[in-house]
A protein has these predicted regions:
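A structural signal for multi-pass alpha-helical bundles of membrane permease subunits
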Residues: 3-296
Length: 296
């Protein structure tokens, strides 16, 4: 028995070591660094809550980047989940070649976070890019998608929305698990297709909607590659997400103490947002009837 335990520990030890070295240690050390003035050139100097005081009272870029991040999240999540659920609903039908389309819609989720796709997206939305060439065929003037502050954030948002495949794959089995008897009962009551979708399908898959909402929101708050490669946070900070601000502070200006403080604020924002979502879920997330209906 002891040999089995030792063997088990030996197998999981690489994961435990990696967790300690690359997750737990940076997590704890960043908390202490957030109370210091540290530029990598000299030892950290404790400065109390000065980083946080400056952040909330003097740093206008902090509030600007936080506002852009919330705008990005509130634009991205509803659109992405709506697309994912809509496409999953269509792919749930038994049609010829449906397997190909399921794969095709999922691929962007695998490739979407790569630098190569971000470069391609930048070329697509450039002033002389493919999108402007396409609308030029219909007589429209070129649009400066990435140079206009009012359009740049939407252009970056579309990249995130395009990566709806992972959420779609999670929605698909949930739709397949909705009991057919529920639809039959609704049809007998004279419900339309739209009413069946809203009154039967959606309530029965709310646990999956909630899961996707939490996962996608957490990822959206931490989005970095797309905005960094496509616009670099511009123009005029219109796409300057909070993650870009953390990166620039820590690795461009080497202000590690302040960068750590910013990272902890982002962590707290995501934690509070998730906490509110979990707290409110008891009012709109429904579980199977054999578990008592609402999540208590």
């Amino acid at each position: 028995m002891n040999e089995n335990k030792l063997l088990g520990l030996a197998w999981i030890s690489p994961y435990i070591i990696g967790l300690i070295l690359f997750t737990a240690f940076p997590f704890v050390s960043s908390f202490f660094l957030s109370f210091t003035d540290y530029d990598l050139m000299s030892p950290p100097v404790f400065n109390g809550i000065e980083n946080y005081r400056y952040m909330f009272t003097e740093d206008t870029l902090f509030w600007k980047s936080m506002g852009v991040t919330f705008a990005y999240v509130f634009l991205t999540i509803p659109l992405k989940l709506a697309f994912a659920l809509g496409i999953a609903f269509v792919l749930n039908f038994k049609l010829r070649g449906i397997g190909f389309f399921r794969t095709a819609y999922y691929i962007p989720s695998i490739l979407g976070s790569s630098v190569a796709i971000a470069v391609l997206w930048r070329a697509l939305f450039a002033i002389d890019g493919l999108l402007n060439s396409f609308i030029g065929v219909f007589g429209f003037d070129p649009v400066n998608w990435l140079g206009e502050p009012s359009l740049a954030l939407m252009s970056v948002t579309l990249l995130r929305v395009w990566q709806f495949g992972s959420a779609m794959v999670i929605f698909l089995p949930a739709l397949q698990n909705v009991p057919q008897s529920q639809y039959e009962a609704a049809m007998i009551d004279g419900a339309s297709k739209w009413q069946m979708f809203m009154k039967v399908t959606v309530p029965l898959i709310t646990p999956v909607i909630f899961f996707n909402f939490i996962m996608q929101t957490t990822q959206a708050f931490q989005e970095f590659t797309g905005p960094y490669v496509i616009t670099g946070g511009g123009p005029t900070y219109s796409t300057y997400l909070f993650s870009l601000y953390i990166y620039d502070t820590a690795f461009k200006y080497f202000d590690m103490g302040y960068g750590a403080a910013l990272a902890w604020i982002l962590f707290l924002v995501v934690a509070v947002f998730a906490g509110i979502a979990f707290k409110s879920s008891k009012y709109w997330v429904f579980y199977s009837a054999d578990k008592g209906g609402k999540n208590g």
